[in-house]
Amino acid sequence: MAMKSRYIWLASIGVAISNLIIGMGVGSYYFTDVVGDIAKLSMVTMFTSLNVLAMVIFPVLLKRYSVMQVAAGVAVVGSVGYLINFFAGANMGLLIIGALLGSFAGLPFNYLRSVICMQIADYNEANNMVRMEATLAAVMNFLGKIGSALGSFMVGGLLSMSGYNGALEVQPDSAIFMIRVLYGLVPAIFTILTVLCAVGFRPLDKWTRENEK
């Protein structure tokens, strides 16, 4: 029954993409080979921890917008952040801004997952189907783990194809460019895909609004 719901697939793909980006773990490569100082990664990580403020903002936004509308808006902001990362080079100011904006992208799919499950379950129940909250959560968690694994696999494969060699002190230009692409462009593209997943929820959002009146 869960597999027949397009909404569980859309939500699960959003979770998988968010975890894929996290699983890529390109930051260490970027700050070692592009910035030239791995120690500066900790500074950027410190600023991205500010995204916990979203936990305060989300409840306010959810009073006016649906979870998926919030997810779409945050994903657009995140994609801008990732694009900044691609063009930032070794500019720490831009890297901090880009990383902070990018860190917001996957928060709705990961931290508001239970709300999404409840919305889908309510829809199932109204259409004479089993609510299946536990099944919905399990599908999301499973695809999320697949996303994390794919992120790591993809980075390893693309870096190898670009000529990256961990034994070299200076990487070839092709490897440096690939690291920049993986740190900026690839996450931006995947984040835009989560926007499309959120847009696919419009009929369900409309149904939810009509049934809350």
Where are these regions (language model features)?
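Membrane-embedded alpha-helical bundles of multi-pass transporters/translocases
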Residues: M1-K213
